[in-house]
C-alpha cells in the first residue's frame, strides 16, 4: 500500500515545487518590468514620490537609467540636481548653476549642456546610461516623464527613499 501512495506523493511534491518556482519567476519579472518604460513620442508616465518623513533625516532619489539617447522631459520640480555633481538646474529662474569647491565659487552655466537642458517646465535629458537625481521633498508629489523625441524612448526609473 505504501508503494502506491509514494508515486502520488512524489508527483504532488513535484507539482507544488514547479508551481512555486513559476510563481516566483512571474513575480520577479512583473516587479522588474514595473520600473522599465518604453514611451512613444508624446507619451508620458507619472512617477509618485512619497518621502519617508517619519525619519529624522530622510532623502529621496530618482534613479533614471536611459537605454538610448532619445530625449525625455522630466517635470514636477522647481530645482533639479544630479547627485554628487554640484549641478543645479533651476527651472523657474532658468539658470544652471555649478557649485564650486568652496561655497563662493558658484558658476552660472549656459543652457547648452550636452546631455541636460532647461525647458519651460522642467529639464530635457538625452544622455545614455544611469544618473541619480535628488528629489527630496517634505510632501508627496508627482514627477512626469515625457518622451519629447520623434522616436520611442526606453528607460528604467525607480524612486528610492533613504
Predicted regions and their residues:
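Acidic, Ser/Thr/Pro
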Residues: 4-162
Amino acid at each position: 500500500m505504501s508503494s502506491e501512495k509514494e508515486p502520488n506523493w512524489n508527483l504532488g511534491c513535484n507539482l507544488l515545487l514547479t508551481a512555486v518556482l513559476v510563481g516566483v519567476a512571474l513575480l520577479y519579472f512583473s516587479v522588474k518590468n514595473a520600473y522599465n518604460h518604453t514611451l512613444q513620442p508624446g507619451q508620458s508616465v507619472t512617477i509618485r514620490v512619497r518621502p519617508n518623513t517619519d525619519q529624522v533625516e530622510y532623502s529621496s532619489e530618482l534613479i533614471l537609467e536611459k537605454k538610448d539617447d532619445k530625449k525625455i522631459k522630466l517635470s514636477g520640480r522647481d530645482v533639479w540636481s544630479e547627485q554628487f555633481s554640484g549641478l543645479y538646474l533651476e527651472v523657474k529662474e532658468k539658470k544652471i548653476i555649478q557649485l564650486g569647491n568652496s561655497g563662493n565659487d558658484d558658476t552660472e552655466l549656459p543652457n547648452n549642456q550636452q546631455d541636460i537642458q532647461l525647458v519651460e517646465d522642467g529639464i530635457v535629458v538625452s544622455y545614455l546610461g544611469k544618473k541619480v537625481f535628488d528629489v527630496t521633498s517634505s510632501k508627496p508629489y508627482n514627477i512626469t516623464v515625457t518622451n519629447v523625441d520623434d522616436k520611442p524612448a526606453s528607460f528604467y526609473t525607480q524612486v528610492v527613499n533613504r
